[in-house]
Amino acid sequence: GFLDIINKLGKTFAGHMLDKIKCTIGTCPPSP
């Protein structure tokens, strides 16, 4: 449903933010 889409977008956005934070700290995996 619509909420499922919102949840997926939220998780994806949160995941991207976490990746950016990890990269800032220097612990992100190398980009493909």
Curated annotation (Swiss-Prot):
Annotated family: Belongs to the frog skin active peptide (FSAP) family. Ranatuerin subfamily.
Subcellular location: Secreted
Record flagged with keyword Secreted: yes
Tissue: Expressed by the skin glands.
Transmembrane segments: none
The protein's name in its UniProt record: Ranatuerin-3
Disulfide linkage: C23-C28
One BP annotation, GO: defense response to bacterium
Species name: Aquarana catesbeiana (American bullfrog)
General function of this protein: Antibacterial activity against Gram-positive bacterium S.aureus (MIC=60 uM). Shows no detectable hemolytic activity towards human erythrocytes.
Keyword entries, A-Z: Amphibian defense peptide, Antibiotic, Antimicrobial, Disulfide bond, Secreted
Location (main, coarse): secreted
GO cellular-component term (any): extracellular region
